Amino acid sequence: MNNTDTLEKIIRHQKTKDPAYPFREHLLMQLCIRTNKRMQDNISEFLGAYGINHSAYMVLTTLFAAENHCLSPSEISQKLQFTRTNITRITDFLEKAGYVKRTDSREDRRAKKISLTSEGMFFIQRLTLAQSMYLKEIWDYLTHDEQELFEVINKKLLAHFSDASS
């Protein structure tokens, strides 16, 4: 018996106790949670082989996409919806690794800018290439139509949760 069979058995038991119990909804929620956890663990393992975590990767890709590969900590924080404290911690780590550097802002002497170093540029390009192959490997398991449906459903659910929390 695999994990989903066990999960279904447990939830089905709840349904036998209460016929009105939302079996499918509970099962879907549990499947989403478990799939998300496995994906996060898988991505963490992949990025860990390169010596970084997902948050550091997101900061690097945000800087890579920025004009002149340079942003202020508050711009990064806003784009990624990370706290300023978290951005500082991540930047400290990336600076020690030699991937970013802090510089004084030309517009405001009190402000700092964070920019990719040449080593950081090379690293993110190499990592992006490896990740491209890795992502294809993960998602090739689903057909193109299944991938599109998965995207539509997830966007719809995310919009629902965003509306519900407003």
Where are the predicted features?
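C-terminal regulatory/oligomerization modules of transcriptional regulators
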Residues: 1-20, 145-166
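N-terminal leader segment of winged-helix/HTH proteins
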Residues: 1-50
